[in-house]
Every structure is written in structure tokens, then in C-alpha cells.
From Swiss-Prot:
Family to which the UniProt record says this protein belongs: Belongs to the protease inhibitor I3 (leguminous Kunitz-type inhibitor) family.
Pfam families: Kunitz_legume
Record-annotated disulphide pairs: C48-C97, C146-C157
GO cellular component: vacuole
Name used for this protein in its record: Serine protease inhibitor 2
Upregulating conditions: By infection with Phytophthora infestans.
Keyword Zinc on entry: no
Species: Solanum tuberosum (Potato)
Chain ranges passing through the membrane: none
Swiss-Prot/TrEMBL site (Reactive bond for trypsin) positions: R67, F68
Subcellular localization, as worded in the UniProt entry: Vacuole
Expression (tissue specificity): Tubers.
Function summary: Potent inhibitor of serine proteases (chymotrypsin and trypsin). Inhibits tightly human leukocyte elastase (HLE). Does not inhibit papain, pepsin nor cathepsin D (cysteine and aspartic proteases). Protects the plant by inhibiting proteases of invading organisms, decreasing both hyphal growth and zoospores germination of Phytophthora infestans.
Miscellaneous comment in the UniProt entry for this protein: The serine protease inhibitor PSPI-21 comprises two protein species with pI 5.2 and 6.3, denoted as PSPI-21-5.2 and PSPI-21-6.3. They may be encoded by two alleles at the same gene locus.
Length: 186
């Protein structure tokens, strides 16, 4: 990480800590709000919940807590903007479902015209599981999917946003309107 690395902050202004769990919450309230949660993917034959969704409103259930696992763990416990990282749902689970907690980008969904976020990723490997947190041009932060392991400035990253799937808001790769989020310690 460069010496001018900027730490990611939670809603109270504290730096994110890889040892703690956070809810990914919306920067908006009411019908535009809603926390991120782990749920069952439509038409999935996976034995465990494997879809990454956002509730339809901020009134109601809280989201599923996550941990951020930075690729630069030798820099301490902080999580920094533009750092390659893995995202893992921080939940108790059966042995069968352990691999269904780590975020990744799934295959292209032709009916929705995009790639959906799901679980089943691998921590620390150069597959479909690398993400970044960047400052939003609006309020809060955006999540990016960054499939290349290099941290060069010309790295190709895609924005994470929301698409509608069977009446639910599913996290997916988008060209416009990335999801603006904040992080709330659990």
C-alpha cells in the first residue's frame, strides 16, 4: 500500500478493522434504503443460501454482518480505500455451508444481462473474489469488483449495484448507478 493510503471509515468515523464485523447499509432511507444480506438465490440448487441481496427498505430486518479481509494483512488490521480485499459473511454456519460465506462474482446471467454477486469465493486467491472499497462520488462508498490481482492503476474494475430478480434486489455488476453504502459496526 502507498504511504498515503486512506482508511475506510464506518458510520461513526472509526477506521474499519478486519477483526470486526460490519453491516453494509445504504446511504438512503425508506424505500431507497436497505441493508445487504445473504439469501437463497432463485433457481439455485446450492445446498446453502448463496445470493447477495439488499433489503427493499431500511425499515425491517438488519443485514447480514460481513468481515473485510485485506490483501495487505501485514499492514495491520486496517482496511483501506482501493485495497484488494475479500468480503465474507460473518455468520455461524454448518461445515457444509462454510464455503458459502465468501463473496464472488458468478457467471453471466443472460436474462438479467449482467453478472450476479453470490457466495462460494475463495479468500486470497486470484479468482472472482477480489473487491475494493472506493469513495463514492455521492455519499459514502462504492464497492468494486476487481478480477486482476495486480494493484496497478490501470486495473479493470466493475461497479457493484443492484438489479431486480424475482421481486428482490440482487447485487450485481452494473455500468451505471453503483450502490452507495456505509459500514455499521455490529
Amino acid at each position: 500500500l502507498p504511504s498515503d493510503a486512506t482508511p475506510v471509515l464506518d458510520v461513526t468515523g472509526k477506521e474499519l478493522d478486519s477483526r470486526l464485523s460490519y453491516r453494509i447499509i445504504s446511504t438512503f432511507w425508506g424505500a431507497l434504503g436497505g441493508d445487504v444480506y445473504l439469501g437463497k438465490s432463485p433457481n439455485s440448487d446450492a445446498p446453502c443460501a448463496n445470493g447477495i441481496f439488499r433489503y427493499n427498505s431500511d425499515v425491517g430486518p438488519s443485514g447480514t454482518p460481513v468481515r473485510f479481509i485485506g490483501s495487505s494483512s501485514h499492514f495491520g488490521q486496517g482496511i483501506f480505500e482501493n485495497e484488494l480485499l475479500n468480503i465474507q459473511f460473518a455468520i455461524s454456519t454448518s461445515k457444509l455451508c462454510v464455503s458459502y460465506t465468501i463473496w464472488k462474482v458468478g457467471d453471466y446471467d443472460a436474462s438479467l444481462g449482467t453478472m450476479l454477486l453470490e457466495t462460494g469465493g475463495t479468500i486470497g486467491q486470484a479468482d472472482s473474489s477480489w473487491f475494493k472499497i472506493v469513495k463514492s462520488s455521492q455519499l459514502g462508498y462504492n464497492l468494486l469488483y476487481c478480477p486482476v490481482t495486480s494493484s496497478s492503476d490501470d486495473q479493470f474494475c466493475s461497479k457493484v449495484g443492484v438489479v431486480h430478480q424475482n421481486g428482490k434486489r440482487r447485487l450485481a455488476l452494473v455500468n451505471e448507478n453503483p450502490l452507495d453504502v456505509l459500514f455499521q459496526e455490529v
